[in-house]
C-alpha cells in the first residue's frame, strides 16, 4: 500500500511500485556546480541556491509514469560536523524532509582525510564522506531481493554504483532500473548498465519542487527556509496538501 499522486491510499496492484534512491551530496554538488557556473566561485548564483530547499518527494513523484506509484524515497547523506551555518541549514532541511510521509533519511558519516599541502608540505585534513555508496548499494540490492519495488530510480551520477546495479540485474532480472542524473552529473557507465533512456534533472523540475518557505509542524516549532536558500519566490504549494499533488 502506498500514497498516490492525489494523496489517496492505493491498493491497486496494477500500479508498478517505485522506490527512488537519492545520493544527497551528488545532487547537492551538481546543483552547486550550476550555481557557480551561473555566478562565480566566490559568489554563486542565488537563483540556484534556492533549489537546495528541494521537495524530494515531489521531485520523485514528477519522475513517475502514469502506470507507477511512489512507494518510498530514500535520501542518503551524512551529517555535517563543521561550520555553524552549514549545520543549521542542513538540520533545517533534514527536519523539513522528515515531515514528508514517504521519505526515509539514511546517514553515512564524514571522516578526516589527511593530505599534504602542495605549497608548504604540511598535513591538512579534509572531511571525506563515507558509507553513502555502500548504503545505497545495500538498500538497492536488499530492496530488490525483498521485492520492495518493481522499478528503482537512482538519482546520482556516481559510477561507483555500477556494480550494485549489475547485481540487481543479475539477481532480479525482472526489476527495472532508471537513472536520473542531477544537474552537471553524467556517467556513460551508469546509463549503459541501467538500460533505457536516462532522466536529466534540470531547472524546470527543480523550480516546481521547492519546499514552502514556512512549514508548520503543529506541536513542534515551525521550520523556516534558511536565508541562503530563499533566493526568489518559488513553490507556493500549501504544505497541508500532499506534495505529490500537482
State where each predicted segment sits.
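Domain-level signal for Mg2+-assisted phosphodiester chemistry and nucleotide/NA-binding surfaces
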Residues: 2-126, 176
